[in-house]
Amino acid sequence: MQKVTFKEETYQLEGKALKVGDKAPDVKLVNGDLQEVNLLKQGVRFQVVSALPSLTGSVCLLQAKHFNEQTGKLPSVSFSVISMDLPFSQGQICGAEGIKDLRILSDFRYKAFGENYGVLLGKGSLQGLLARSVFVLDDKGVVIYKEIVQNILEEPNYEALLKVLK
C-alpha cells in the first residue's frame, strides 16, 4: 500500500490503487447543486482529475487556482477538482477566490472516488479525506498519468502533467 505524509503523520492510502494503463472507474460524485454526477466526461481529449484534502487548505487552494488558470489555455481538456468538502463550502470558497472554470465535485456522500482510485487517507487526524493526487485520463477513460503527492503539504508536479497534455 502506498503511503503519504502530513506533518509528522504517515497515512496508508485505502482503496483500489489505479495504475497507468488501467481503465478509470466512473464513480458518482456530488456537484454544487447537490446532484449526483458521473466523474467521466465524454467528448474530451483529456480529463484531468485532481483530488485534494480540502479547499480550505492553502496548498489545496493553490492547486485549484492553478488548474482554473489552465482551463482557458487547454480547451480540449476537462478539469475536475474533487474533495470531501460539502458542496456548499466548495461553492463559497470557489466564489470568493474567483475559481469558476473548473468542475468542482465532492466525494462526501459515498467516498467512491477515494476508494476506487486508491486515494482515501487511512488512520490519522485527516482520516477519510482524499490524498493530494492527479490523474489524467484519455478520451477512452484510460489512466495515462498518475501522481500521488507524497507530502500533502506540497503541490503536484505541474510541469510533468502539462507535458502529458501537449
From Swiss-Prot:
Thiol-specific peroxidase that catalyzes the reduction of hydrogen peroxide and organic hydroperoxides to water and alcohols, respectively. Plays a role in cell protection against oxidative stress by detoxifying peroxides. CDD domains: PRX_Atyp2cys. The active site is a conserved redox-active cysteine residue, the peroxidatic cysteine (C(P)), which makes the nucleophilic attack on the peroxide substrate. The peroxide oxidizes the C(P)-SH to cysteine sulfenic acid (C(P)-SOH), which then reacts with another cysteine residue, the resolving cysteine (C(R)), to form a disulfide bridge. The disulfide is subsequently reduced by an appropriate electron donor to complete the catalytic cycle. In this atypical 2-Cys peroxiredoxin, C(R) is present in the same subunit to form an intramolecular disulfide. It catalyses: a hydroperoxide + [thioredoxin]-dithiol = an alcohol + [thioredoxin]-disulfide + H2O. This is Thiol peroxidase. The active site is at residue 60. Homodimer. Keywords: Antioxidant, Disulfide bond, Oxidoreductase, Peroxidase, Redox-active center. It comes from Helicobacter pylori (strain ATCC 700392 / 26695). It comes from the Bacteria. HAMAP family: Tpx (MF_00269). Disulfide bonds join 60-94. InterPro entries: Redoxin (IPR013740), Thioredoxin-like_sf (IPR036249), Thioredoxin_domain (IPR013766), TPX (IPR002065), Tpx_CS (IPR018219), Tpx_Peroxidase_subfamily (IPR050455). GO terms for molecular function: thioredoxin peroxidase activity. Its EC number is 1.11.1.24. Belongs to the peroxiredoxin family. Tpx subfamily. Residues 18-166 form the Thioredoxin domain. It holds the Pfam family Redoxin.
